[in-house]
Amino acid sequence: SGLKAAAEENGKSVKKSSDILIVSDINSANETIRVYNYSTGVQYQYYYGLTTGFFDKYGNHMSVSDIHQGDVVDISGADSDGKAKRIQKSDKVWTNDAVTNFSVDKNKSVLEIGNSSYRLGERTMIFSGSDVIDTDSLTAQDKLAVVGIDKDIVSISVTTGHGTLQL
């Protein structure tokens, strides 16, 4: 089918060991996962279903609900319906899910976490809820989930924001 061909073609064009695929959207109603290729800046959409295996970075089974925006995943294979066979959290990145002591130096494109400095690149994805935001929207009250490779930040997700109080 055309769907299968598209999925296999995408799988071949995306699947390089060096590629970093950042989850930009998960739609459980349509069973789709959109990923952003950090290396190329290109977005891809994959379908998943009952035959898709979801795994953590150690290879242990998990649920699709354990994958979130900002996670880095590896996607491989396509079944006869063109759905991904395996979606696994990447072991090529580090994750810190509870960052509260941070600051952003916009001039240097640096995120300071505690006493350590990390680079914010042009392709670093920053999420708040379902929105993609920029560093200007981060506040000291936010709690962040940060994903990186060495000293480079790949993605940031605001897990708890300062919010607003509506009276």
Ranges and model annotations:
Residues S1-L50, F55-E122, F127-L167:
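Short, flexible, surface-exposed loop segments at domain boundaries
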